[in-house]
Design a protein with these regions (language model features):
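Histidine-centered metal-binding segments
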Residues: 1-21
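Conserved, well-structured core domains of diverse proteins
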Residues: 20-68
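Alpha/beta enzyme core
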Residues: 56-70, 81-105, 115-262, 269-295
Length: 295
């Protein structure tokens, strides 16, 4: 049994040690943030996006680009009213599309709640279409880490190729980066072979500075993709958010050599908007990102 020597200097050494280790941890994150150029202030980001789109949008608004975008879509159903029958019908539309337009690729994935992964797996006959499942207490992410890990592992076991989880924004807002990143790393481990998409919920983060920080934390925690939004309860994707995320991905790639994908979700209603996002990704990250493995 260890004998504790009580010091009489009046300081709580254990407490001081905790402070020290906390400040070392915080320094570690700031060190990572400092490797990235500061995000442009919000108004300047808007100006940069507008200039980029004015210059390049028209050249990308072509049938070829729209076909490429079609092949990068995650066809999604995430409602409280989802049933096996509805999900099966959705999968049938993907199966039926297969081979009807040789010049248009099928969607990249079908995204559902964990409960329906098995249904998609049974129904899906289309080749090379992946099964994506949300997990981790989607969409608020406010549950126990153990539950998130179990839900992720079960979805993968049922047949999910991709897992979409929301970053814990509560941890983010209180600068609790240690728990935030540890949790994401544990979820990543429970994905095994499946890809991890980390949703930042950019509409809740609001500022470009927050969006950049969240992108950096997600990437260093093992995200294969960073994704804008859940489409639930907060504003969806914006051009400014996509621009900021792309800039962070580019710097991360130059530092580590790792390519992280970007998924735009929530509020993309028109072909024009889809092409605008495509244009932002193309101009910042280049053509090598314009495929379903990274976009």
């Amino acid at each position: 049994m260890a004998h504790h020597h009580d010091c009489e200097c009046g300081h709580d050494h254990h407490h001081e040690h905790e402070h020290e280790s906390n400040s070392v941890q915080i320094d570690r994150y700031h060190e990572a943030f400092n490797k990235f150029e500061s995000a442009l202030p919000d108004t300047q980001t808007t100006e940069a996006v507008n200039a980029l789109l004015e210059k390049h949008f028209q050249e990308n608004f072509t049938p070829e680009v729209l076909k490429t975008i079609h092949g990068c879509i995650d066809l999604t159903s995430l409602t409280s009213l989802d049933t096996k029958e509805n999900i099966w019908k959705m999968v049938d539309t993907v199966n039926d599309f297969e081979g009807t337009r040789p010049d248009v690729p099928n969607v990249a994935a079908i995204c559902v709640y964990p409960l329906f992964v098995e249904t998609v797996k049974q129904a899906l006959t289309a080749q090379e279409v992946k099964i994506a499942s949300v997990a981790g207490g989607f969409p608020s992410s406010q549950t126990f880490t153990e539950v998130k890990i179990a839900e992720t592992a079960m979805a993968v076991m049922q047949g999910a190729d991709e897992i979409d989880v929301v970053m814990n924004l509560g941890y983010f807002m209180e600068d609790n980066f240690e728990e935030l990143t540890e949790e994401l790393q544990e979820i990543k481990e429970s994905c095994r072979h499946a890809h991890l998409k980390v949703i930042l919920e950019t509409g809740a983060l609001v500022t470009t500075e927050n969006i950049q920080k969240a992108s950096i934390l997600a990437m260093y925690s093992g995200a294969d993709f960073i994704k804008t939004s859940t489409g639930k309860g907060y504003p969806g994707a914006t051009f400014e958010a996509a621009y900021t995320m792309c800039k962070a991905i580019k710097t991360y790639h130059s530092i580590t050599g790792n390519k992280v994908g970007i998924k735009i979700s929530g509020g993309v209603r028109t072909a024009e908007d889809a092409v605008r996002y495509y244009t932002i990704v193309k101009e910042i990250l280049g053509d090598e990102w314009l495929n379903k493995d990274l976009f």
